């Protein structure tokens, strides 16, 4: 189905469905843990592809690995299995564009980013925005940071 216009503030292609998670519990904490691991796996897989000299087209999961994506929110539907649907932004790469380019580690990091031995993830550019939550919630518990 199509998303209502009010949810298209990031892009026309701003949401994706994760594969069915048989082991995910109904609680958001477990879904959050699974989602982080899934994204990390995809991110590492992409880096390996680029390091080998091959190019990789952009899919939804690789888009959220970009440093420009600062917000991600997920909902889930629990029936026989847990289905997870996520919305992310702001919009990063577009379909068909490269995500990573080869080069020296940290050589192309934007201004005001951390990269190197003093950072949590050595070799990855990280924006210093500690006030942004890793995952945000929309209307599940009465507290929301969605607009």
Swiss-Prot record:
Q: Which GO terms describe its cellular component?
A: extracellular region
| Tissue expression remark | Expressed by the venom gland.
Which InterPro entries does this one have? Answer: CAP_sf
State the UniProt keywords alphabetically.
Allergen, Secreted
Q: Which cell locations does it reside in? A: Secreted
Name the source organism: Phoneutria keyserlingi (Brazilian wandering spider)
The record's similarity note reads: Belongs to the CRISP family.
Q: What is this protein called?
A: CRISP-1
Where does it mainly reside?
secreted
